[in-house]
A protein has these predicted regions:
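Conserved C-terminal helix/tail region of periplasmic/extracytoplasmic solute-binding proteins
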Residues: 2, 177, 183, 389-437
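Conserved N-terminal structural module of periplasmic/extracytoplasmic solute-binding proteins
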Residues: 2-24, 31-120, 135, 183, ...
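A structural signal for short loop-to-beta-strand junctions that line the ligand-binding cleft
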Residues: 101, 108-109, 137-176, 317-318, ...
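Hinge/lid segment of periplasmic solute-binding proteins
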Residues: 115-166, 220-223, 307-309, 373-378, ...
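Extracytoplasmic/periplasmic solute-binding protein
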Residues: 158-162, 167, 191-243, 287
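Glycine-centered hinge/linker elements that transmit conformational signals in sensory
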Residues: 196-201, 239-270
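Extracytoplasmic/periplasmic substrate-binding proteins
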Residues: 223-226, 254-335
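Long, aromatic- and glycine/proline-rich binding clefts that accommodate carbohydrate-like moieties
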Residues: 357-407
Length: 437
């Protein structure tokens, strides 16, 4: 069964809290909550498709999603009068760059963002209100629900999906067969995943059951939280100010990972893995089953026989962390109708099928999960279908809490798997304090 995404309402926040949250992620902005984008939600003079009149548009994206952004921009520029000048900014510098540009009024017409940081921008008025434009699209209800939800602030929609990266279970079919497991039956519960990993690890030599980034907070939220969501639980409250990471279900998840660490079911290096190399182990063919980003699908060797599956919960269910980038029109743009022309085109059948799906990437629409490109490989359909049931967590203090190597989430992770597991409640309170600060 699939665990459905639940719609959430993100209550308004005072300007003091908004400014504090922006500072926490390295932004400096002079915009107040709502900004000039509040009154720009109407469809516009160009109709639902916007205006294509030869305008030059500026667009920013981070290096992590450079390939996908360049492919979309190249296809758009080739087929439209409007032309987009794309600037790719180093990922580690991106938030500071956006913040500085917001403060000086120099944001581009379009800018993408890691979807977990979108709430910081929407609550600070950096994006134009696109509510009416989005809802006028014939496939509006099929747009990646988690991205739309993350970009909704005080009832208005500010962004659309740009690039998608989902957490997915990868498993080695050859190792499954050698361990006496059915290569066509991936685990459907966390308990089965544990059993499969241990059976493969027992093969010995250089073969290992699984792997994970044990010193990587971002890896943890991306691959551990889906097991909690799959059980129908939340990891935070709706407005992202209180953690629920000490629940019985969460404890069950941590216990499995703790068992893998204690019994050396993981490949060497998991304890110290900071995320820089954690996806490089599985392609070598010596790992049985592990969760990874969907974007690694196309990087697998041609001779590696592997399958993909949803990340399961302790007793069943399935979910995924819907990451990647969302994109919107800056509140300072003087070319809203032209910028919308690009966004609307990027979500249409032509771009989603002939650019996104053709490159083996996850499509931004649930109604296109099965298409002429994904149908050639059922594994891609499996990944695409997860979009409908996945989640993107919402919190203004996400970065400082979960991505910062000195943040409280990594401490909770490390204690739960390698340290003093009795500190779980205490560590959960520390996460809540960071979220609400």
């Amino acid at each position: 069964m699939r665990t459905a995404t639940r719609a959430r309402r993100h209550p308004g926040r005072g300007s003091t809290r908004t400014i504090a949250a922006i500072a926490a992620v390295g932004l400096v902005t002079a915009c107040g909550s709502g900004g000039s984008g509040e009154t720009s939600g109407e469809t516009g003079a160009g109709g639902p498709d916007g205006v294509d009149d030869g305008t030059t548009l500026t667009m920013w994206t981070r290096a992590a999603t450079q390939a996908q952004s360049e492919a979309l921009v190249a296809a758009y520029n080739e087929s439209h009068e409007n032309q987009i000048e794309l600037t790719v900014i180093p990922t580690d510098d991106y938030q500071a760059k956006v913040g500085a540009a917001a403060g000086s009024g120099e944001l581009p017409d379009l800018f993408a963002s890691d979807v977990v940081f979108v709430p910081n921008y929407t609550s600070s008025g950096l994006f134009t209100d696109l509510t009416d434009r989005i809802e006028s699209l014939p496939y509006a209800d099929a747009l990646a629900p988690a991205h739309i939800d993350a970009g909704t602030f005080e009832g208005s929609k500010y962004v659309v999906p740009h690039t998608l990266d989902l957490s997915v279970l990868f498993y080695n079919k050859d190792l499954y067969a050698k361990a006496g497991l059915d290569p066509e039956q991936p685990p459907t519960t966390l308990a089965e995943w544990d059993q499969h990993a241990r059976a493969i690890d027992a093969l010995g030599d250089d073969v290992h059951g699984t792997f994970f980034g044990g010193n990587c907070g971002g890896c943890g939220v991306f691959t551990w939280w889906p097991s909690i969501w799959a059980a129908g639980e939340d990891v935070m409250n709706d407005d992202g100010t209180e953690a629920n990471l000490a629940s019985d279900v969460a404890q069950q998840v941590y216990d499995v990972y703790r068992g893998w660490a204690a019994d050396d079911v993981t490949a060497p290096g998991a304890r110290d893995e900071t995320g820089t190399t954690w996806t490089g182990y599985f392609p070598e063919g010596n790992i049985g089953v592990m969760p990874m980003p969907s974007t690694t699908f196309g990087l697998m060797p041609d001779d590696l026989d592997f399958g993909v599956a949803p990340i399961p919960g302790p007793d069943g269910g399935e979910s995924t962390f819907v990451g990647g980038d969302a994109i919107g029109i800056s509140a300072a743009s003087e070319h809203v109708d032209q910028a919308w022309n690009f966004l609307a085109w990027s979500l249409g059948d032509e771009a989603q099928i002939d650019v996104v799906a053709a490159n083996g990437d996850v499509v931004a629409r649930t109604d296109l999960a099965s298409n002429k490109h994904s149908d050639a490989d059922p594994r891609l359909v499996t990944v695409n279908e997860l979009l409908a049931s996945g989640r993107t967590p919402y919190s203004l203090n996400f970065g400082q809490t979960f991505n910062d190597p000195n943040g409280p989430w990594l401490t909770l992770m490390r204690d739960a798997v390698y340290g003093d597991e009795t500190k779980l409640e205490e560590n959960n309170e520390a996460v809540s304090s960071s979220l609400s600060s």
